[in-house]
Amino acid sequence: MSKNNPPYLSKKRDASINLNGKVSDCNGEIIWCRHIASYWSEFFCSNSGKIDYETFSSPQLLSKAIVIQENKGTNNIKGDVFFVENESWGSVIYNLFLQLEKENKSHTSLEVHSPGHAMALGIKIKNDKENKFVINFYDPNQTATHKRVFFCTNNICDIINLTAYDFLSEQCLKCYGLKEDTLSLF
C-alpha cells in the first residue's frame, strides 16, 4: 500500500467509545461484536454506504436498534464466503470493487470474522469528478467510528497491497486471534 494513503480514523468521531459486550437489547441479551458488526453492515447497505454514528455512540440507542435473534444469522449469510490470509485482504477487496463495477452497483458490505472477533467492511464507489474507491473498516471495539481509506482510479491496483495489518494494530491482531491463526472469514 502507498505510505501516503494509510487507513485513518475520522477526527469527527470518538474512537474511545466501546459498547461491545456492554449493552443489552430490549430482551436483556448482551450485544456482542457479531451483533454490532452485522448491524453496521446492514446499516451501511441500506443507507447508500453512509453511516450515522448517533446510534453507535449511545448505549440507549444501540440497545433499541439491535434485537438479537441468534438463529437469524445462519439464514442470512450471503452467497460468497472467503477464507482470507492476513496478507491477502486487499486482493479480496479489489475483486469486490471489480464486481461492483461489473454489476453497476455503488456499494456493498461484508462481515469479517477472526477466531476471536467480528468486524465489518463497507466498500463503495464514489462518483465525483474523479472516481474514488472507498473502504470503510469497522471494528465494534471502536463502536462509534471506522477506519477509512480511498483510492482513485489511477491507483486502484494499490488496493491489492492492503493487509489486515493496515487496519488492525499489533495488539488487536493478537487479541482477535489473528497472530496465531492468520485466516479471516469474509
Predicted regions and their residues:
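A general structural signal for short secondary-structure junctions and capping/turn motifs
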Residues: 23, 111-112, 127-128
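Catalytic Cys-His active-site segments of thiol-dependent hydrolases/isopeptidases
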Residues: 127-150
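Ser/Thr- (and often Asn-) enriched beta-sheet segments in non-cytosolic proteins
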Residues: 16-18, 109, 134-136, 182-184
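Short, surface-exposed coil-to-beta transition loops
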Residues: 114-120, 130-133
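Active-site nucleophile-adjacent alpha helix/oxyanion-hole segment immediately C-terminal to the catalytic cysteine
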Residues: 1-70
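Noncatalytic regulatory segments and standalone regulatory/sensor domains
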Residues: 143-186
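Short beta-strand micro-motifs enriched in acidic
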Residues: 122-126
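Conserved active-site-adjacent core of cysteine acyl-enzyme catalytic domains
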Residues: 43-115
